[in-house]
Each structure stands twice: as C-alpha cells, then as structure tokens.
Amino acid sequence: DANTNPWGYKLSWSPSSLIGASKRTARVLIDEKEILWPDGETYENVFLYDVPDLGVFEAYANADSTLYKKGYGIPEAKTIYRGTLRYPGWCETICYLNKIKFFETDVRPTKGMSIAQFTSIQAGYPGDPREALCKRLGLEPWSSFILRMEWLGFFEDTILPFESCSPRDVISLLFDKKLVFGPSERDMVVLCDEVVGEYPGGKRKQYKSTLIDFGVPGLWTSIARTTGVPPAIAVRFILEGKISTPGLLAPMSKEIYEPVLEELKNEGIVLEETKEYV
C-alpha cells in the first residue's frame, strides 16, 4: 500500500547497502550444476514469481546459495536457490545502471557540478542528460528506465553538495532523498520458502512457507522487526541455557531455529505453510 513511485521500492534500511548489493556476485545450484553470476549479472537472469494475495514479483539470485547444502546437511539436494523478490522493473533498472557504471566508487572533482551534468558525463555524451542516456543505452525518451531516472532526479540542475564524489555517492544521495516512506506509510517484508522432496516410487511433494509482514508507522519497520527480533530471542535463549553450543553460529541447526521459530509466533511473525504433491 506504500508502493507509490515508479521504482517500486522505498528504503527502510541503508541506501549504501542496497547499492552495494547491485554489484554482488551470486552463485546457485540448479539441477546439480553450479552457476556463477559475477558483478551484478544476477539481475540479467531474472524470473517471475507469484506470491498469493500479493501478485507477481521479479526474483533474482542473491549471494552464494551453495553454502546451504553443507549448512543444512542436505548433500543430496539438486537445486538450491536463494533469491530476492522485487516489484517488476527493478532488475531492468539495475542492469541499465550497471551498464553506465553508476554503482562504481571512483571519485572525481564535482565542485559546482549539477546532477544533470554528472549524468551526462557518466553516460559519455555532453549536453542533455536524457538524450545522453538514450544514446548510450539505445533507448527511447519514453522508456520506463528513462522515466524512472527523471523521477529520481538525475536530470535536475541541482548542484551536487560534494567537492568530489563517485557515481555511487550520487545515486545514494538521490535514493536517500526520494525512495523514502512517508510518516503514515509502512514497509512490507515477504519471505517465501519452497522445498520439493522426491520419495521412493517417484512421488514428489512440494512444501511452501510464506511470511508477509508489515511495519507499524511511527513504531517500527518490518525489516527492523523481522531481522532484529530473532537474534534477540536467541540471546535470551542463550542466557536461559536453551542454546548451549558455543561460538559464532548461523541459525541452521535445530537447536537454534526450532525454538526461535516457535517463539516468533508469540511476536506475530508466522510463516503460513502448505504442502501438495507435484
């Protein structure tokens, strides 16, 4: 209900972390074959994913999925894919931004330079930034990417507040300015798990778990609650002696995830589960 901009995204966490993820390398296991997508290529390998009651999202691989094979003790797994969901259009936008190297960290002098001038220089053509991007990327002025760039402020004559900066600094500045929640708006976190098991005789059964959680305006964001409450519960369990294994642990053992998931129900963080033969 707060999806009110052409980017289909608002920030309830660090802009720099979101931007850093745009260059992240991803690795997945598909049909027993490892596939590596370096330097943001994962955004070029996207598929559509339907979430009941919410609609269709884009899904793309996030970081190294193959680690879960050992972590969860499932050496027989043929496919392991950890992905991120976004509203349609996000991956196209990130791909174009990667092509014009707007996520790079090379610093250059920008004293007295406008955002529009910076955009033209980054696109490699002097003059109008819209025309520069269209020439560089082979797009029409009315394309969705160009319209998103206009809305975010890339074509404005506003002077950059830096004597020197990188392309990443500019996009972070605009993200922080425009991709924000209003005081009465709430964020949403969606988590979907799918596990398909094959049984003797060839029968295959699919297990699905879905979490849809919303923040509360003026109190907390969903991203803060769903990432902060689980480790807080784990800390309490350590103090109570319910978790006794020493060291820095990922929540991949039953000693950790079973009691934490059970306690999360009391906080209203619940995954709805379904299963069916496929």
Which stretches of residues belong to each language-model region?
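C-terminal catalytic/substrate-binding lobe primarily of soluble NAD(P)-dependent oxidoreductases
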Residues: 1-278
